A protein has these predicted regions:
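Intrinsically disordered, Lys/Arg-rich N-terminal extensions and targeting peptides
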Residues: 1-20
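Short amphipathic alpha-helix segments
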Residues: 43-50, 83-92, 117-134, 154-162
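A common structural junction motif
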Residues: 92-99, 133-138, 162-171
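Short glycine-/aliphatic-rich beta-strand segments at the starts of folded cytosolic domains
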Residues: 106-119, 146
Length: 177
């Protein structure tokens, strides 16, 4: 629950404590509920984030190359950027990789959002046709449900539409593909 608590703190600092206006916070809360995080812990994390004395965590993206020229993106949450740069550089060096400059590999990746929804009573083709209007790029089914992939910017619109249709969201998140 610690990781989800930190995600809640960062989401509140970035977009405010109201999940109705902060889609990122809404997604993190939903993911917390999916792993049975108690409601008290969620509320405590939101309250802690509203406290001005709380350390300010920032998301920082590091780019580099692993052995054989494999592009690597490392997303971190830190309150001390200098320490984090040193740690990430150390890991790259230990693995015979190299830390790149800003923009050296990020262009190779698409920042996407994804949703896993309950497939009961839903047709994959119908969902795909309906959610293309909200930004969905790829929709497919597997044994755990229906997966929807879309650009990062479409997260709020798709989540709001799924909630308005009362479709159960099993999980949601962000990926770089």
């Amino acid at each position: 629950f610690t990781r989800i608590g930190k995600d809640i703190v960062m989401a509140v600092k970035e977009g405010g404590p109201d999940p109705d206006t902060n889609s990122r916070l809404r997604a993190v809360i939903q993911n917390g509920k999916a792993v049975n995080m108690p409601k008290d812990n969620i509320e405590r994390a939101i309250k802690r984030a509203s406290d001005k004395s709380q350390g300010d965590y920032k998301e920082v993206l590091f780019e580099g190359y692993a052995p054989h020229g494999i592009a690597v993106l490392v997303e971190t949450a830190t309150d001390n950027n200098t320490r984090t740069v040193a740690n990430v550089r150390s890991f790259f060096n230990k693995c015979n990789g190299s830390l790149g400059t800003s923009g050296s590999v990020v262009f190779m990746f698409d920042h996407t959002c994804n949703f896993r929804i309950n497939a009961e009573g839903l047709d994959v083709d119908d969902i795909e046709l309906e959610f293309i209007d909200y930004g969905a790029e790829e929709v497919f089914a597997d044994e755990d449900g229906i997966l929807i992939y879309a650009p990062f910017e479409s997260f709020g619109a798709i989540q709001a539409e799924l909630e308005s249709r009362e479709i159960e969201i099993l999980s949601s998140g962000f990926e770089r593909i």
